């Protein structure tokens, strides 16, 4: 039988075209991107995206704010942070050392109440805090107990809020001598000026003070870690011991502290901190000159500090700063973070807060991620042109600030969040016309994200549409979708508006944007046209299908979860992604996930946007718990109660939403399907909401349409299959019947190369395997079709079968027959189903689990007659299968029916 709609799965890669109905008066130019996915670059940390705030923002009634800006009731700012993907905030700046609005010794030190507000705000937003403590102790306002006061504050934060603490920092920009000057001060060694006649005395005096403060803090918080020195200069101006032959304070400080340990033996310095305002002080730069500079090649490509390229400003290009200040830090084995950064110091109105800033920020983040940076915090110094979060109106009226929202820069951060999680992938760019376009690739074994930024614009007379051919060598594409960042007027970078995913970023709810499903061709590549002043994030999803409590880690290693007869949760994971990696010796062995939770049924496992795994279990007490990896492949956070004890929710399934956040679904004791969702990727959980209108049996499945929206399928009490999908409004469509054959409640789901969802089930009437498919991605449905019984010789496939996907996208079904053997059938290269064939394995329980290894081979798991876990796998992608192997751990189960 030929599978309806399956002809498109016959190739490993796909060609797509995207056209936008904008007036076209610009030339089109070709660009070819070749991505080598066989080798990975740097892994981008999940907390890469950050903002920075002044310590004075922590205080009440500052910058026009009535009360505290950092307050858990400031839901507008919290929602914006979540929607643009911020995971880290740095609180510090010049005001940490008492300098407010240029007035020395004028800023107060935050109280415990101020600290409470900050960290409660951070917890609500799902961000961690780099918390700066005062270091400057000049003679003008000397405090003999300053270090002890810092230690008390650090101890208070550690005791109450360590879960929301990234690390501590001490002081701010100690190398910037002019910031430490004040009336009457000619030479004050306490502020790290160079003492006349003692060359190079500034840095050693700082280092001695920093070490004294750090040791004082560690006497109260032994496990304290630090991000320092917050070097303010990004030229040679403050190099130590002198500008001519010295090195930056960042490099020297890293050399001095790279081997230092805190009180528990861990590295004291978790990251070296550098500041960077690319364009320096804007001086007399006009708005248009600033836009042209921000989008210029010079900032990205030049290797020398220069003036311009337009206007009088001096800029420090990325390659120069990397080579002179930050590459030496990496060579010392220490991560580095840009804890304060922006386009120009103070900003240029109409440029720094215009759409150009969105493209600049996206480019900046990707360039530095590709060069090993651990993260960036764009400074949000209330309320100036470079800010990402601002009030409206700005400046604030006397009644106080309000209506906090994101400027276009936040849209660039959002685009990075959608395409900046995973490993940096090597990319070669063929650009024969030398068009002002940059491109970056980030991915893992499951998803590849290619970001293309077209910075051509009208004012420089180079406006052009880039026709980009993407060649993901070694990456078998299963489906492709597109996310567009635009201001709606290609070529114009000066507008004050932006959209991403055809939506604005709100401050009062979830971002409603969605991915564009692209049409498929068959010539082995992806083609998109990216208009002038537009960025495109292309998501290429590999042909991989997981069914059951199994997921792939960011490094390509599979991880599988089970429960024992006591309800304890266990996991086992591959030692790595390198082939071979499927046999028993290639796995770490079963380890219990402690914490006291006892599961009553199977775990549901999904992957967050930052590539950490998250697991959900229904407990024996009736509530639902979740547990997530703190970092990809890392330790687990511990169990958190998600509520629902009064609803008796069980039979869980989890899926991703369009923005990368997760939703978890389960059947309640009342027979309704219930859902809880993260408020943003990796952040918080909503209350449980009932998807009422149809009673759904356990055995339902959840899939994700190519546009990113989740869709639920389940068998109702009438035996028909019903579906319910996320609507553009953020709600749900309501239940709709897929008429046809009545089905056993245990369904299976898969998505083909062109993005259509397929639903499989066992028919009630003849007990054959049936399937139905979408006619187009996210569209209407074809009629149910009987898969047939060729080769089964009277054997009936039992409910609990799984649908896998070969590396080239062809579906393969594996199920246990009524004879106790495992049978499989697959789509052939001609598009027909092969007929059923035996995989052996007598005594395997009907409910199976399947996933793909990093190289695309399918690996199947089941519970054998001896109650051990058994596995069988393809010996090469799309090839023959191994023999069954006993993975041990007697009594382990994947599903509640196996208990």
PLM regions: where:
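Conserved, mostly hydrophobic/aromatic
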Residues: 51, 89, 168, 173, ...
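N-terminal signal peptide
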Residues: 14-30
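Noncatalytic carbohydrate-binding groove/subsite architecture in carbohydrate-active enzymes
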Residues: 147-154, 199-358, 371
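Acidic, Ser/Thr/Pro-rich beta/coil linker or hinge segments at domain junctions
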Residues: 474-530
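Aromatic/acidic polysaccharide-binding cleft in carbohydrate-active enzymes
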Residues: 338, 342-439, 443-446
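N-terminal substrate-binding region of glycoside hydrolase catalytic domains
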Residues: 32-156, 163, 169-170, 174-175, ...
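A structural motif
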Residues: 544-899
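Carbohydrate-binding surface patches
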Residues: 432-477, 482-491, 533-539
């Amino acid at each position: 039988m030929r599978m309806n709609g399956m002809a498109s799965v016959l190739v490993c890669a796909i060609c797509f075209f995207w056209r936008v109905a904008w007036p076209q008066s610009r030339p089109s130019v070709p660009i070819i991107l070749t991505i080598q996915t066989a080798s990975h670059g740097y892994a981008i940390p999940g907390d890469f995206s950050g903002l920075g705030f002044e310590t004075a923002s922590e205080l009440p009634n500052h910058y026009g704010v009535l009360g505290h800006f950092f307050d858990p009731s400031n839901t507008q700012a919290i929602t914006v942070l979540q929607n643009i993907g911020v995971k880290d905030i740095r609180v510090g700046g010049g005001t940490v050392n008492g300098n407010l609005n240029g007035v020395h010794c004028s800023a107060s030190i935050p109280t415990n109440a101020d600290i409470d507000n900050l960290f409660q705000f951070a917890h609500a937003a799902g961000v961690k805090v780099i918390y700066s403590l005062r270091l400057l102790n000049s003679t003008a306002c000397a405090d003999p107990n300053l270090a002890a006061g810092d230690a008390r504050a650090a101890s208070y934060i550690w005791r109450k809020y360590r879960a929301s603490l990234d690390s501590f920092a001490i002081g701010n920009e100690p190398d910037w001598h002019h910031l430490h000057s004040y009336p009457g001060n000619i030479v004050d060694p306490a502020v790290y000026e160079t003492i006349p006649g003692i060359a190079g005395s500034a840095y050693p005096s700082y280092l001695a003070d920093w070490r004294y403060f750090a040791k004082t803090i560690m006497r109260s918080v032994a496990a304290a870690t630090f991000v320092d020195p917050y070097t303010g200069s990004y030229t040679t101006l403050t190099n130590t011991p002198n500008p001519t032959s010295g090195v930056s304070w960042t490099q020297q400080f890293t050399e001095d502290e790279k081997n230092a340990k805190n009180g528990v033996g861990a590295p004291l310095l978790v990251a070296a901190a550098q500041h960077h305002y690319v364009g320096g002080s804007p001086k007399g730069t006009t708005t248009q000159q600033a836009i042209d500079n921000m989008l210029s090649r010079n900032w990205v490509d030049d290797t020398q500090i220069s003036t311009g390229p337009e206007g009088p400003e001096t800029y420090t290009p990325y390659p120069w700063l990397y080579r002179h200040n930050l590459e030496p830090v990496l060579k010392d084995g220490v991560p580095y973070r840009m804890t304060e950064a922006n386009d120009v110091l103070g900003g240029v109105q109409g440029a720094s807060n215009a759409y150009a800033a969105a493209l600049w920020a996206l480019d900046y983040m990707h360039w530095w991620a590709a060069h090993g940076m651990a993260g960036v915090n764009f400074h949000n110094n209330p309320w100036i042109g470079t800010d990402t979060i601002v009030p409206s109106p700005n400046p604030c009226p006397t009644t106080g600030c309000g209506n906090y929202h994101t400027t276009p820069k936040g849209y660039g951060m959002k685009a990075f969040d959608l395409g900046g999680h995973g490993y940096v992938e090597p990319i070669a760019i063929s650009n024969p016309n030398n068009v002002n376009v940059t491109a970056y690739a980030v991915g893992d074994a499951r998803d590849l994200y290619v970001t293309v930024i077209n910075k051509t614009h009208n004012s420089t007379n180079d406006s052009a549409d880039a026709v980009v051919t993407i060649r993901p060598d070694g990456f078998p594409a299963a489906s492709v979708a597109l996310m567009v960042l635009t201001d709606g007027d290609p070529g114009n970078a000066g507008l004050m508006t932006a959209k991403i995913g055809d939506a604005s970023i709100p401050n009062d709810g979830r971002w409603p944007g969605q991915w564009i499903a692209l049409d498929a061709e068959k010539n082995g590549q992806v083609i998109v046209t990216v208009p002038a002043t537009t960025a495109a994030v292309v998501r290429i999803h590999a042909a991989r299908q997981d069914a059951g409590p199994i997921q792939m880690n960011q490094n390509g290693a599979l991880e599988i979860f089970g429960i024992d007869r006591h309800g304890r949760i266990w996991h086992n994971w591959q030692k790595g992604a390198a082939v071979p990696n499927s046999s028993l010796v290639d796995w770490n062995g079963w380890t219990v996930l402690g914490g006291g939770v006892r599961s009553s049924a199977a775990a549901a496992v999904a992957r967050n946007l930052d590539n950490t795994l998250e697991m959900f279990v229904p407990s024996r007490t009736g509530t639902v718990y979740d547990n997530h990896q703190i970092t990809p492949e890392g330790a687990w956070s511990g169990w958190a109660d998600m509520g629902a004890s009064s609803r008796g929710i069980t039979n869980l399934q989890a899926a991703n939403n369009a923005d990368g956040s997760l939703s978890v679904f389960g059947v309640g004791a009342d027979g309704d399907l219930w859902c809880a969702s993260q408020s943003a990727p990796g952040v918080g959980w909503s209350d449980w909401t009932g998807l009422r209108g149809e009673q759904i049996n356990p055995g339902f499945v959840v899939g994700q349409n190519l546009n990113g929206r989740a869709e639920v399928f389940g068998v109702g009490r009438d035996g028909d299959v019903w579906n319910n999908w996320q609507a553009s409004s953020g709600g749900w469509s309501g239940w709709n019947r897929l008429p046809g054959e009545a089905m056993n409640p245990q369904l299976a789901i898969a998505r083909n190369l062109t993005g259509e969802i397929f639903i499989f089930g066992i028919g009630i009437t003849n007990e054959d395997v049936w399937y139905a498919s979408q006619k187009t991605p996210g569209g209407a449905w074809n009629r149910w079709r009987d898969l047939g019984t060729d080769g089964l010789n009277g054997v009936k496939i039992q409910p609990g079968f799984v649908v896998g996907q070969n590396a080239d996208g062809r579906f393969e079904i594996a199920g246990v027959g009524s004879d106790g053997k495992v049978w499989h059938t697959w789509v052939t290269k001609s598009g027909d189903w092969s007929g059923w064939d035996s995989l052996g394995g007598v005594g395997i329980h009907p409910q199976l689990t399947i996933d793909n290894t990093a190289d695309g081979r399918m690996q199947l798991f089941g519970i054998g007659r001896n109650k051990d876990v058994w596995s069988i796998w393809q010996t090469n992608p799309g090839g023959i299968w191994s023999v069954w192997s006993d993975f041990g751990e007697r009594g382990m189960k994947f599903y509640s029916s196996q208990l």
